[in-house]
Amino acid sequence: MVDIHTDEEEKNFWKKLAKFLRRHGVHYEHKELKREYMRLCRKYSSLLQNRYPDNKIEINISDVFYELCTLKNSRVTREFSDAFGYIFRAESRAYFKVYDGVYDMLGELNRQGVKVWLLSNAQAIFTMPELEQLGLVRYFDGIAISSDAGFKKPDAEFAAYLFAKYPEADITPEKCLMVGNEYGSDGKVAENAGMNFLYAVSNLTPESERAEYQTPSQKE
């Protein structure tokens, strides 16, 4: 749906972030900032994985940013650390754009009365502002983000989270068609949760999967 590229290894990325934090009373040098960020990501991943050893887990990066900031300044609010998280994402993002035809497709589904939900492996503090900026939120009847659920595709628990989040919609697996461009996550979550699956080939699709899942007309 969205073509996005981020680079957290760009030469000045961590320097820019450290400079921003220092201006707001959170004193890191860039190397320490990167080191602590990576450490906290590992910490939260380990804690959640220990709690759910058999699941594909997804941490909430908002917790990482909050602890990262409060380690240096206990007066930092969650509002500030989330704002820093948005800056983190914006600085790391090389580009993001909607794939050709997505607006038309979603609009047509809406016009035909088809209910559309988004099941996304993502961080809410990154992705929700991007969806708003791209004008995509209005097309969906509901959105489930893995960082809010604590689980990610291909775990069936993430699909169950979506179904439970919108009980009034009476969503059940057999009523759903999962559409995605990554077989390992989208196809497998459909399989694990009992949904049908439509494979959408994109520039992210590995060549091996393109060949394996082509339709007969494409092969011809």
What is each of the regions a protein language model found here?
Residues 1-99, 111:
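N-terminal helical cap/lid subdomain that shapes the substrate entry/recognition surface
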Residues 7, 28-31, 103, 107-110, ...:
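Asp-based, Mg2+/Mn2+-dependent phosphohydrolase catalytic module
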